[in-house]
Amino acid sequence: MQIVVVGVDYKTAPVEIREKLAFAEAELGAAMKQLAKQKSVLENVIVSTCNRTEVYAVVDQLHTGRYYMKAFLAEWFGVKVEAIAPYLRVLEGEAAIKHLFRVAAGLDSMVLGETQILGQVKDSYLLAQEVGTSGTIFNHLFKQAVTFAKRAHSETGIGAHAVSVSYAAVELAKKIFGRLAGKHVLIIGAGKMGTLAAQNLYGSGVGKVTVVNRTLEKAKQLAKQFAGEAKPLGELSCALLEADIVISSTGAKGYILTKEMVAPLEKMRKGRPLFMVDIAVPRDLDPALADLETVFLYDIDDLQDVVAANLAERQKAAARIETMIEAELMAFSQWLQTLGVVPVIAALREKALAIQAETMKSLERKLPHLSERDWKVLNKHTKSIINQLLRDPILQAKELAAGPNAEEALLLFMKIFNIEDAVKAERHIEQAKSVQCDEQDAEAVRAARPSWQL
């Protein structure tokens, strides 16, 4: 069995290709069920976001599995395989497993270290459980990947620092005021960057938002998003008296606020600090405003410097996570290798215990005079002999499973002990148990899903 991932992302395909291969959320479960019917595909999970569509699968034959995974994508979206093939990323084995860990941890995201993808990976896995396309291998792998990604974020703090200009403004505001609860935000203009900064500030718990714009109607539309107040540009000075934080992005030709305009307001503000962020190009706020004692002025270049420094910190954290992933790969590989040897060991034990049981029956016929206590002692000691005899072969089987050419080595091991048929029977039993457990897990997921959040 092999693990394969086939898909597109923002690195391999332009948006016009990605949008053609994006699954609607409502159809994702049906798509996984359809993929499960494809030849060679044993398990599957599909992750589909605005930046990526990736099909993860456990296949019994590598070449056949790859072929049918590509064919499935082409058929589902009504395109030819040849049309999408140049944009597809195809990874196999350890490379595919490593990719999942990197994706879940946010290392493969457009915004390095973002956490939204972790929730999306988790939701896709939960859905696969619900529809029955995730089995023993993916249940283990995806749980491990999600758990690891949470730990990686917690231990490295990769997402702790802003890497967008709009959120960098929030970070600076927190450094000046500490807590933002109850602070009054004044938005000058209705530009995109200013709006994003306002959204981030509002999400951080500021108390009130006022929007000032040349066009009052636009100011009202933006203010409505934050349950705020709209004012015409002529009332800017009055709005400044109440504000703690000013975000300006008007796109005006000259300065809309100068040192001479703000200086008279300082006494009226009674020394309250005024945090001003100029996101406009050309600038809205006179650089001389920084000379005022209570004004903290930052422009777009200052914010870019903050973002660059924060990105460098994220890259350091990402390097740590890459190292952590290597340990996770080793742990999963060891688990996967032992997965194949479990039925072999079980069959070997069953054969040995069957021989011991037959021997005990023979002894009962030949030694009818033995007491019940004698039989208990005899049974205990014969089982002890069995366990001692099996100890070295079991250790050897585990080593074979972890070594090169494990499949061929285990086949030879089974032939030596004549347990091929018994191993097949054990695997059927394990498969039946796995299906039953998966059904129980899926039922538990359906019952608990609303409360299982990141």
UniProtKB/Swiss-Prot annotation:
EC number: 1.2.1.70
Keywords, in A-Z order: NADP, Oxidoreductase, Porphyrin biosynthesis
Catalyses which reaction(s): (S)-4-amino-5-oxopentanoate + tRNA(Glu) + NADP(+) = L-glutamyl-tRNA(Glu) + NADPH + H(+)
Keyword Oxidoreductase: yes
Superkingdom classification of source: Bacteria
Swiss-Prot/TrEMBL GO biological process terms: protoporphyrinogen IX biosynthetic process from glutamate
Signal peptide: none
GO molecular function annotation: glutamyl-tRNA reductase activity; NADP binding
Pfam families: GlutR_dimer, GlutR_N, Shikimate_DH
EC main group: oxidoreductase
Family: Belongs to the glutamyl-tRNA reductase family.
Note: During catalysis, the active site Cys acts as a nucleophile attacking the alpha-carbonyl group of tRNA-bound glutamate with the formation of a thioester intermediate between enzyme and glutamate, and the concomitant release of tRNA(Glu). The thioester intermediate is finally reduced by direct hydride transfer from NADPH, to form the product GSA.
Domain note: Possesses an unusual extended V-shaped dimeric structure with each monomer consisting of three distinct domains arranged along a curved 'spinal' alpha-helix. The N-terminal catalytic domain specifically recognizes the glutamate moiety of the substrate. The second domain is the NADPH-binding domain, and the third C-terminal domain is responsible for dimerization.
Complexes and interactors: Homodimer.
Protein name: Glutamyl-tRNA reductase
Organism encoding this protein: Geobacillus kaustophilus (strain HTA426)
